[in-house]
A protein has these predicted regions:
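Short, structured beta-strand-loop surface elements
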Residues: 52-115
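Residue-level detector of intrinsically disordered, flexible termini
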Residues: 2-3, 9, 45, 84-86
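A generic local structural motif
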Residues: 6-9, 32-34, 52, 116
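Extreme N-terminal tail/first-helix region
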Residues: 1-21
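Short beta-strand segments
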Residues: 17-51, 59, 66-69, 79-84
Length: 117
């Protein structure tokens, strides 16, 4: 049996958590951590953020991000090592709708309320 890919295991663990800290980077390299909801999407992860947010602007110029399991308030446990990743953004309506459905299935009512705000 082939050995499990540790990246896949990390992706599964992150996708199963309630929140991850998504850290994007300003042009000057300064990190900007934000707790976000996350859902597994094949061998990657998907998150949602409204159009025009700082996260999207930063990902647009610097796709390098780090992700780590965190609390709702964004606290990362001392023993958690952030995972380096590459983020992409989409505004394709079909893709946004598909990811929104995945998040709604995982988070239920709290996600639906979030989408109303």
């Amino acid at each position: 049996m082939p050995a499990a890919d540790p990246r896949t295991n990390a992706t599964l663990a992150l996708g199963a958590s309630d929140f991850i800290q998504l850290t994007t980077f300003r042009r000057n390299g300064e990190p900007v951590p934000t707790p976000v909801w996350v859902v597994p999407d094949g061998d990657t992860l998907a998150v949602f953020t409204p159009a025009g947010t700082g996260k999207l602007k930063r990902i647009g110029h610097t796709p390098r991000v780090t992700v780590a399991v965190c609390t709702r308030g964004g606290r990362v446990a001392d023993d958690v090592v952030p995972v380096e990743a590459h983020a992409t953004a989409t505004d394709d309506p079909a893709e946004v709708a598909r990811i929104t459905r995945l998040l709604a299935d995982k988070y239920g009512l709290q996600f639906k309320i979030f989408m109303l705000v």
